[in-house]
Structures are given as structure tokens and as C-alpha cells.
């Protein structure tokens, strides 16, 4: 933590700068009413007008039309849901899968209390938090990669 030096108001150079208005926030243009009352509404209304104009002028559909009677064989979620999908896919009891998903944020909330005595920001001086981060990242990557594979190879990633 750095030590901030208090300004010496008896210094003639500083007094001259302050007399000219330097060192204060009196430069530029005030945010009220110029920005907040005039510029921001113009930008917001212009953005809305552009979106409405594009929707009216080009009402094309995005992607293929949905067919509820023809579903794909393997439905995969978005990539950021792969670890959660893998947990739900491999655990036989769905209640246990939901409890495992709830335990992840609950476990992350306990990490600051495990090392609350340690005030360092260097990760090498906080071994518990660093270990939890590295193991959690490895498990999330393992589960995420496994979710893209068939169920028989998903836990071992086809390595074993």
C-alpha cells in the first residue's frame, strides 16, 4: 500500500496552479445537463431506431425453422454448459446431480474463509486458494471435454 503525500497549500507554485484552476475538476463540460439530458437520450433512441429499422426492413428468420417432431439424436448444450451437462449425464441419480451442481458454488464460497488469515495477493503465498483454483479448472476442463464424447468414453476421455 502506497503512502499518499498531502499537498502543501503554502507552496507558491501549487497556489498559482490552483488560482488558475488547475488541479480541480473545473475543466471540460459538465455532465449535467449536457450529457445526461441531451446526448444520452439521442444515443439510446438512435440505437432503438436502428434496431427497429433493421427488424422492419429485413425480417428474415435466423436459422432453420423448428420442427418439434424431428429432434436430433444427441443434443448438446452450449460450450459453457458442458461441465454441468456431463455431471447430469454421468450421475445416475438426478437429485445427486443437482446436489453436485449446487455444491460447486457452495464450495467456492467457502474458499475465502479457509484462508482469511492470509492477506497476500500473490497466488504462490496462498496455497489453499491456488490449489482449489487449479483442481477446479482441471475438473471443469475434464468434464467439458468429456461432454463432447460418447457416454462410454466420457469419463476417461478415451485415454484409459
Swiss-Prot record:
Q: In its keyword annotation, does this UniProt entry include Magnesium?
A: no
**Per UniProt, which keywords does this protein have?**
Chloroplast, Electron transport, Membrane, Photosynthesis, Plastid, Thylakoid, Transmembrane, Transmembrane helix, Transport
SUPFAM superfamilies in the record, alphabetically? a domain/subunit of cytochrome bc1 complex (Ubiquinol-cytochrome c reductase)
Domain of life according to the entry: Eukaryota
Tell me the InterPro entries matching this sequence.
Cyt_b/b6_C, Cyt_b/b6_C_sf, Cyt_b6/f_cplx_suIV, Cytochrome_b_C_euk/bac
One GO biological process from the UniProt record?
Answer: photosynthetic electron transport chain
| Parts of the chain that traverse the membrane | 36-56, 95-115, 131-151
Task: Provide a GO CC annotation, any one.
Answer: chloroplast thylakoid membrane
| Recorded coiled-coil stretches | none
Record's miscellaneous remark: A longer mRNA that is not produced by splicing has been shown to be transcribed in barley and maize; it can also be predicted for this organism. It is not known if this mRNA is translated.
Assembly information from the UniProt record = The 4 large subunits of the cytochrome b6-f complex are cytochrome b6, subunit IV (17 kDa polypeptide, petD), cytochrome f and the Rieske protein, while the 4 small subunits are petG, petL, petM and petN. The complex functions as a dimer.
- This chain belongs to the protein called Cytochrome b6-f complex subunit 4
